[in-house]
Amino acid sequence: MYRSHTCGELRPAHAGQEVTLAGWVHRRRDHGDLIFIDLRDRYGITQVVFNSAHPTAHEVAETVRSEYVLQVRGKVRIRPPEAVNPDLATGEIELEASEAQVLNPARTPPIYIAKEGGEDESVRLKYRYLDLRRERMQRNLILRHRVVKFIRDFLDAEGFLEIETPILIKSTPEGARDYLVPSRLHPGKFYALPQSPQQLKQLLMVAGYDKYFQIARCFRDEDQRADRQPEFTQLDMEMSFVDQDDVLDLIERMFTALCRTVVPHKHLPTPFRRLSYAEAMERYGSDKPDLRYGLELVNLSDLLIETPFQVFRNVLNSGGQVKGIRAPGCAHFSRKQIDELTDVVRAGGAKGLAWAVLPTDGGEVRSSFAKNLAPGEFAAIVERMQAEAGDLLLIVADQPAVVAASLDKLRRNLAERLQLADPNTLCFAWIVDFPLVEWNEDEQRWDAVHHPFTAPKDEDMHLLATDPGKVRAKAYDLILNGYEAGGGSIRIHRRDVQQQIFSLLGISEELAQAQFGHMLEAFEYGAPPHGGIAPGIDRLVMILADEPTIREVMAFPKTQQAVDLMTNAPSPVDERQLKELHIRIVMPE
């Protein structure tokens, strides 16, 4: 037996007992006759005292260094009051070692384990097995385990079945590029790794498994924007005989119970707010707004239709908008800070930023545009924005999509500068009534906003043939603190409607049959009404753990370039393997 207890287990009640511990040397302090070693495992740290009265064990302690794997036997004793360490769960006791054995020595690690170092993330990823020894990473992975376990237990109690779906599936166009797997047995043919189990879970509904879930691994060969991974984990769910409210109510109950269990110290406003897509875009410029703070967008367009200021007027005459944000108490912002905010909106596509400072002393307004307005227009803007002395008004004039994107960026930037987002608040909300399709200007066709299996709202069905852009979907997104936490919809369950949507999306009958024939045929054998959702596990745990990226809550993530620095994947393969697969590599010139 290597150990009788873990390094986080011993308490004053164990005093006088002979125990055996095994773990890693966290810290070592040599005081000559006395050597103190903090022995660590994932359960905690225990201070071990090596006294020269036990010379064999003391000699072992003289040789060990950080991260040696050590087994120690000895007697538990109470620490003197002045030596109690309140930062350790085991801080009231220590182990007086009588025997010790080095189970494995260790080279000097390239990263500090005992404390957070300033090393580059690439070093952490290359030596991830060392990085994972750190308290922060252990805490994150334990939290992840608790989240997944809670979900499994909750859904089991709700009558759901956890059913695994295949990893090797048919390649179908669902948005991002598929990861392809060549078939040795069928030369020239390929499997795909699933971007999601979307079609398979719908087929499970046809099969009669009315409550399905899976902790699903998903794969997308897309350009790695910001904080994405080529492989990720989602809670995949589907239910039969449900409408939108049924799905939303279940998920809200589950996430409320989850958060109150695993992060009880966080504030969780309930019930979750519900915003239509149109309302979210109008008020926040985003379909995933952070609702922990205000800074809402204010539409000024109707006040400026006749304005002599040509910048605003030209935008409005071309179908654009003029919108602004009131930054309360920010009249003290310097010109340099305002220039930085201008760069923020330019990153969102805006050509510039109009601004006005309302001084606190009742003095003259400073503004980049007020002098160009007609009498009364600036006063109308101040009134509409409910501005007060000491406020900073920030305005963008452009096409609606640019106004939304630029003011969304500005809103988030201001919130960060002003520290408006409480890190201990979890602000969930539902975004509903998404458009079913959006026009792709480059390819001159309609694209599905979510995916082609999303059902249109019944009351909008008559618009499919005449005005598809106005058709709303039975789709919903769960948002959390400015992130999309999960997306779902009520699905199409009739072949004729599914074919109508395929046709609208420019998918011919021949292509639909080739790509989705199995789905269309299944719908002819009594497919029930059904719907589901797929919250992302990585993103959820990231937010609950207060981490900046999903890489911090994944055991072995890849870089933004989709490279595994630890194993050097992807890597070349043996020519013999390629030959067996009937594949020849043609490198780009």
From Swiss-Prot:
Main localization category: cytoplasm
GO BP term, pick one: aspartyl-tRNA aminoacylation
Disulfide topology: none
Family: Belongs to the class-II aminoacyl-tRNA synthetase family. Type 1 subfamily.
GO molecular function, one term: ATP binding
HAMAP family: Asp_tRNA_synth_type1
Role according to the record: Aspartyl-tRNA synthetase with relaxed tRNA specificity since it is able to aspartylate not only its cognate tRNA(Asp) but also tRNA(Asn). Reaction proceeds in two steps: L-aspartate is first activated by ATP to form Asp-AMP and then transferred to the acceptor end of tRNA(Asp/Asn).
Important for tRNA non-discrimination (site feature) positions: 31
Taxonomic superkingdom: Bacteria
Gene3D superfamilies in UniProt: Bira Bifunctional Protein, Domain 2 (3.30.930.10), GAD-like domain (3.30.1360.30), Nucleic acid-binding proteins (2.40.50.140)
Catalyses which reaction(s): tRNA(Asx) + L-aspartate + ATP = L-aspartyl-tRNA(Asx) + AMP + diphosphate
InterPro entries: Aa-tRNA-synt_II, aa-tRNA-synth_II, aa-tRNA-synth_II/BPL/LPL, Asp-tRNA-ligase_1, Asp-tRNA-ligase_1_N, Asp/Asn-tRNA-synth_IIb, AspRS_core, GAD-like_sf
EC number: 6.1.1.23
UniProt keywords, alphabetically: Aminoacyl-tRNA synthetase, ATP-binding, Cytoplasm, Ligase, Nucleotide-binding, Protein biosynthesis
Name recorded for this polypeptide: Aspartate--tRNA(Asp/Asn) ligase
Organism: Chloroflexus aurantiacus (strain ATCC 29366 / DSM 635 / J-10-fl)
Cellular component per GO, a single term: cytoplasm
